[in-house]
């Protein structure tokens, strides 16, 4: 890898290398692929999801984790996938199949963004229970995905978990199976942008 800009190896680069190179094998990597990967997976999918949901929750849920919720089928379908896949995830980690691990996280991020878009909580302001439930579900998904991302990008995940006043000691893989881990009524904190897009060089 010969970067256009000289810089030290950082956490974002590690994420890219783990995604692109199978353990023990060679990989085809490039600066362009790195930039596309970071911009797509981390800046657009993970970082943008966090910012969108937080901003909506602060504006429409008094800046708190919603208390009155009632899960519907769409909510449980996406929430339960994490617990349903827990043993498979553990197995892939134990066998150092980190490509699968990253792919699972990326697919989960796509599903999370699709869930929030499809549910359209901004159109549910006359149904506060439904609005609250969508927001709570989205926050739980962010929490679950953050727990999964922690071994790969720990520093960035700890920044994201400040949303919920959670820290390193709160992160346990088995807790991705819990659908009501977050404490209802607790305050939600604003966070800085997690990942700035990498601007491509034109030279």
Give the positions of each predicted feature:
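Extended, non-catalytic structural segments that build the interaction scaffolds
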Residues: 28-42, 84-103
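Generic structural concept
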Residues: 43, 47, 79, 83, ...
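Single conserved hydrophobic/aromatic residue that forms the stacking wall/gate
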Residues: 1-11
């Amino acid at each position: 890898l010969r970067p256009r800009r000289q810089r030290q190896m950082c956490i974002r680069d590690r994420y890219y290398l783990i995604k692109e190179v199978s353990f023990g094998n060679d990989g085809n990597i490039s600066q362009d692929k790195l930039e596309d990967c970071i911009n797509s997976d981390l800046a657009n999918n993970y970082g943008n999801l966090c910012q969108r949901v937080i901003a909506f929750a602060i504006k429409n849920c008094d800046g708190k984790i919603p208390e009155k919720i009632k899960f519907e089928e769409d909510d449980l379908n996406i929430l339960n996938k994490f617990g349903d896949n827990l043993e498979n995830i553990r197995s892939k980690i134990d066998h150092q199949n980190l490509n699968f691990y990253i792919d699972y996280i990326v697919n989960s991020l796509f599903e999370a963004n699709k869930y929030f878009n499809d549910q359209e909580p901004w159109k549910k302001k006359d149904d506060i229970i439904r609005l609250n439930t969508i927001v709570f579900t989205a926050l739980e998904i962010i929490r679950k995905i953050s727990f999964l991302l922690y071994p790969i990008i720990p520093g960035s995940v700890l920044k994201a978990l400040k949303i919920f006043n959670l820290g390193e000691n709160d992160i346990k893989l088995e807790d991705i199976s819990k659908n009501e881990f977050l404490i209802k009524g607790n305050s939600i904190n604003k966070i800085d942008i997690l990942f700035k897009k990498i601007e491509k060089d034109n030279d």
